[in-house]
């Protein structure tokens, strides 16, 4: 049975669910999840959790993400990226200095109105389904945090590359759209590559075709406790081990805080929280 994490470099034109479905078939494991959707046009870091490791998705999904994005000024589309239909073209008077000046307003805590072409739901229907039917509904602004935002380079007339580090739930194409609006010329996203997610970088990512061609695909999985490497480790046995496996708090001499908890044979049991000499389970990962 396959259990663990594989960081995929998602290819263009694949949906995140396409990638998960392919991995599900290759590894013969129905429990497969990912830590953050990438649009089909996007490429880059996509951590995929397999088997018992899917229990870690909720932690990974909350993490910051980093992107390299293409920004095209002077063009507005219905999807806020270059895959959509052009709805407006405007002259661009802004130069790189103007762009860099405009970015200041988008750093820190901001609000975004989610795009109609998104998987968010309204009355049980996904927004993109309504958009394709020619309907537009009101969307409430949502708070997001832009931790870093900078111009990397100018790649052509009115075209730039941006580096974006942001919180969960940020729409980079909406960011591009809003930056263009702030400059008075409109804009859209022309490319997107995720360079970091859930603490994993492009250097750790495996091309999807490498997984599909591997003689032993399961060998490419890293253990789920690798995701929690920042936490200290403690080993339990005897009565404490039995209580841990029953989901009960157990005595522990560890300092207060969160810990990786292992059995005497090195099996990763759970992520726990120690307080006042007692360890309680945050999330268990052992085989039942």
Located regions from the model:
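Accessory RNA 3′-end/elbow-binding domains used by RNA modification enzymes
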Residues: 1-9, 13, 17-34, 38, ...
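Catalytic cores of RNA-modifying enzymes
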Residues: 1-167, 174, 178-204
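A short, terminal or domain-edge coil/loop segment
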Residues: 88-91, 126, 169-173, 242-256
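A short local loop/turn or secondary-structure capping micro-motif enriched for an aromatic residue
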Residues: 137, 169, 277-280
